[in-house]
């Protein structure tokens, strides 16, 4: 018999071989980012905590690189007063090799030790800590580095000690940043207002105010990372607004108080819509309209209903617009799903997308799939991410997959300027994205905690408990009930198949036509619940029955906030609204991709032409998944828009301070629609010439490279002079 110790060693050797192969393809920063993502997958699903961990890991990687950099890139934490925490650093004591290869090796070693120490500290108590610790040990072995080296004396021992020192300092800072890490991020003031909901039992289990959040209590609970929960999870991070951010500023802050607790509201979205339970209303009521749309979209989760959609970029497009909260019905297609912009004037779906792929000049191919498959796949893909690393980690995975890997060796900041070495581009990209994701968590959860808004499972079941609100002469009338719509929401009568459902008299209750829920799935590998009539007080979101809905309030949508911020940031980072090559794809194989139930019924690829297309799909997925109504989505997008842009511009002042100042003063100049108008004043004149001359001869690309030769030279000057003193169209 082979002993367990030998099995572990054998596994480590195999993993070391795989890690070594990976190292030949990815930078050290990329490898350690993957280790953080894997640690997240092995932990509980805590988006706020993981956004902070990704941000802190990115700070360490960047500062380890910047400490050895001889250009004007600045450190963000090392040697700085970081939000009141001083991280001392004697830069004269650090030996910086003059040889470029030796300098890069020092950067890689420092990154490795810093990342190793941070992951050990942050994930040592995670449910799969043994796996995570094994992974990072194997990573260290693959790099032939000693895990037992713990010195922080960088003057004596150089790079490995610098990595240890930085991690030690950042871990200490983390105890002061308002996250309450020392008490495992426990709530410091918030108290739940409403009783827990027991979804396995019909109704809401005693919900009094339908505008407030309920915790989900289950007989058997597993979170979105697949971890077994032994008790009902409390609200995650209701006072996360207290955490120190990256690019958040006092001008973004509103201070508020509720129920004896103070809240920092960042980018305050204002109040959501509320239900007045004493006033009659139909679906013209904004609260009922919002939650009614969640039921309506639940009806789409049937791949056999005959509705086929072309989900290719030639059919679907998102232009980045965000509706006002009082004008949502002009943006979302309540009955048929998706955006109103996806339909023509006659109500026909599709054909409103991108005309051609700008990189190939060819039209995008059609991608016909059942609407029920598309809706189910995106609900699961974006719920867990490409591999269960929570929404902040989703976007690191997409950055890694399509940009850092896809464009290795060709990186240019903003798509302009000289080619940047992969390691430098990776650490700078991670810092910008990490800062944005961290600020998103702070801003979105500050609203979640203060507004304490209910989830659809509570709202829909609450209306169902109260009956119908359409006709006082019909049974079970109440102003707070569900409005009746023939064929969609009806009353159970004596002849109804549901009249004695569950061995109880159900006549007079309200039924809805929607996804039937987990009660109709015995074996998820082979069963599909489908769409049919169910009792409305038994409505389920399209999620695992052991999860149901996230353990925090709904307003605003974290997915919408994270995804919009990431899209804004990646547009700026790459200098293009399009994914590299004009297309990013993720495969959903037939009968293998879905976890909640069997499916999809055919193999297909999710496809996005632009970063905005992907962010929009992420946001909409939460409505098909039954997790958010539109009122949660639109304000989240708006917050994400501001956070993503602010985070990128702030990161740029750190990672490229000389270029950010030299080329336009507020970051690099964006590629202009009006060729030659570099300062954006609507004409080509002396101000543009001054900016042009600062880039002349520097190998700069982007708006100054008028003839697209990857250099700014005499031919570009001649082209600019031909445009001189002419207005933009």
Question: Can you say where each PLM-predicted feature lies in the sequence?
Answer:
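N-terminal secretory signal peptides that target proteins for export/translocation
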Residues: 1-4
